[in-house]
């Protein structure tokens, strides 16, 4: 093997090790049997959510995983291995690959890295069942809005009841101003009476 070839392979190992180090999740899958059209479709779905799919030789994967501190992954690198890397979304690679495997029997998840920790297939499958980040944010927003909406309805109901009962809803500031006005008038009246005496 020439020095140039060794240097190229070392550079490739460094690149893949950086992918592992810079990703919050990386899911390993067996892609044997996927058609070109299926592979293109899968790549497009992953790319839409900021996930990159790489098919890498097992020797390079093994060295790169060791360099990144994920040597426990080495048992997964048998047969043609593809890895879906995500730098931001912990759930997306597992969710998209799992969903795609439902329509493409040839795709098989093996394991990977979730939140920078080595994860077995059961863990990958649990994460795959979670909704997308956008859906989670929408659900969280709905949870926050629900109590606020209930409070607003309650305030409105109280106001409507007061109106129906013929009450005037004075604000505390108005009540205080009214009390101050009465108090000032009373003091002026007392002063006037004292002067007349």
Swiss-Prot record:
Provide a GO CC annotation, any one: ribosome
Which keywords describe this protein according to UniProt?
Ribonucleoprotein, Ribosomal protein, RNA-binding, rRNA-binding
| UniProt-listed HAMAP family | Ribosomal_uL10
Which portions of the chain have biased composition (kind: Basic and acidic residues)? 179-188
Name of this protein:
Large ribosomal subunit protein uL10
Q: Where is this region: Disordered?
A: 162-197
Q: Which InterPro entries match?
A: Ribosomal_uL10 (IPR001790), Ribosomal_uL10-like_sf (IPR043141), Ribosomal_uL10_bac (IPR022973), Ribosomal_uL10_bac_type (IPR047865)
């Amino acid at each position: 093997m020439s020095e140039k070839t060794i240097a190229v392979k070392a550079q490739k190992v460094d690149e893949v090790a950086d992918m592992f180090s810079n990703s919050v999740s990386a899911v390993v899958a067996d892609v044997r049997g996927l058609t070109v059209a299926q592979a293109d479709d899968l790549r497009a779905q992953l790319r839409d959510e900021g996930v990159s799919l790489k098919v890498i030789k097992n020797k390079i994967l093994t060295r790169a995983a060791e360099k990144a501190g994920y040597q426990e992954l080495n048992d997964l690198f048998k047969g043609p291995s593809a890895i879906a890397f995500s730098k931001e979304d912990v759930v997306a690679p597992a969710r998209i690959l799992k969903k795609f495997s439902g329509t493409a029997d040839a795709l098989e998840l093996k394991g990977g890295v979730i939140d920078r920790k080595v994860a077995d297939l059961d863990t990958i499958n649990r994460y795959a069942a979670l909704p997308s980040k956008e859906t989670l944010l929408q659900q969280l927003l709905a949870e926050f809005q629900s109590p606020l909406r209930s409070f607003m309805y309650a305030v409105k109901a109280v106001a409507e009841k007061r109106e129906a009962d013929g009450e005037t809803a004075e604000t505390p500031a108005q009540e205080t101003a009214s009390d101050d006005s009465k108090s000032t008038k009373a003091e002026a009246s007392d002063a006037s009476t004292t002067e007349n005496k």
